[in-house]
Amino acid sequence: MQFKSLLVSALAAASTALAQRSCGTPSPTEEQTEVAQRLQFNEENARVAGNATRLAPVTVNVYWHVIATSNSVSGGYLSQATLDKQLDVLNEAYAPHDIQFAQAGADWTINSNWASDRAELAMKRALRKGTYADLNVYFVPGTPYLGYAYFPTTVTTGSSAFYYDGVVILSDSVPGGSLSQYNLGHTATHEVGHWLGLYHTFEGYQCGGNGDYVSDTPFESEEAYGCEIGRDTCPSQAGDDPVTNYMDYSDDPCFTHFTTGQETRMHSYWTAYRASYQ
């Protein structure tokens, strides 16, 4: 997976040309995978010992930022009604895991340079709101990806890492967008999963090792596209490929769930890195 800033395409080419899901979330660093491995160890020990505790429900404040080239849908402009639908999609996906989202604010900016995803840090420095516990979502029409996010980590408020934090979403992938495979709003579901600490289900691209560092997601040696129900790229390991998991690359209609282990992981990361900022 390539880092977001390595690929920037022309505004027009970044929308309807996408035939497969693409995620520009940076690969986890060695430090981040060490944290994930430690969390997996602690979570699995608690589960085996029978003393795993249900963490308190989490409500995340969301700040929407719509960046467009004009006040038209073709320019990337999204209405408040569309933002409301996107919020509903997130809440439906995350509610079974005691995570909910509440709109804290929304703003609209006409800026062709920002809309092309060529000035990420400048855009975020100007628009970001709230604390490290608050989710900032930036809708842009010109990113070469369906979306990207940043994993939770230790940050100093006001630092570049603080401003980079958040989720960037291709405008056409919102509910009712022009991308027929990806217009149910689950690009945001997927990227918010990263923001809460989850890796791709195919992390590592192999049938052994640590995978995504979550014990109950089956191993998967490559990403899944479309909706390949019953696919098994790791026949020597238990379970078919988790193609309906939100953290795979399947089409939006194929997605159905997070696992119990992923739920625990999101709460673990929230407690470790974001909860104290509320």
From Swiss-Prot:
Positions of disulphide bridges: C227-C254
Compartment annotation: Secreted
Protein name: Extracellular metalloprotease GLRG_06511
Principal place of residence: secreted
UniProt EC number: 3.4.24.-
Keyword terms, alphabetized: Disulfide bond, Glycoprotein, Hydrolase, Metal-binding, Metalloprotease, Protease, Secreted, Signal, Zinc
Pfam family membership, one: Peptidase_M43
Gene Ontology molecular function, alphabetical: metal ion binding; metallopeptidase activity
Entry keyword annotation includes Cell inner membrane: no
